[in-house]
Amino acid sequence: HSSNDFCYLPAVRGRCRGYFPRYFFSSETGKCERFIYGGCGGNRNNFESAQECGSTCYPRE
């Protein structure tokens, strides 16, 4: 297992009601996808940009 196992966690909005567009790595599609983050809670599969998500979670060949 890699140190980036959190990339395979589901996207979690969290319990707050904010509206923060974020990105998560989807293990189903193998791509970084947009979701809405509530502002608190959640997990580490939560990135401010698709680029940050990709550089962290895309499998290295």
From Swiss-Prot:
Residues 7-57 form the BPTI/Kunitz inhibitor domain. Its main location: secreted. Disulfide bonds join 7-57, 16-40, 32-53. It is found in: Secreted; Nematocyst. GO terms for cellular component: extracellular space; nematocyst. PROSITE patterns: BPTI_KUNITZ_1, BPTI_KUNITZ_2. The record marks 17-18 as: Reactive bond for trypsin. It comes from the Eukaryota. InterPro entries: Kunitz_BPTI, Kunitz_BPTI_sf, Prtase_inh_Kunz-CS, TFPI/VKTCI-like. Belongs to the venom Kunitz-type family. Sea anemone type 2 potassium channel toxin subfamily. This is PI-actitoxin-Axm2b. It comes from Anthopleura aff. xanthogrammica (Sea anemone). The lineage of its organism: Eukaryota, Metazoa, Cnidaria, Anthozoa, Hexacorallia.
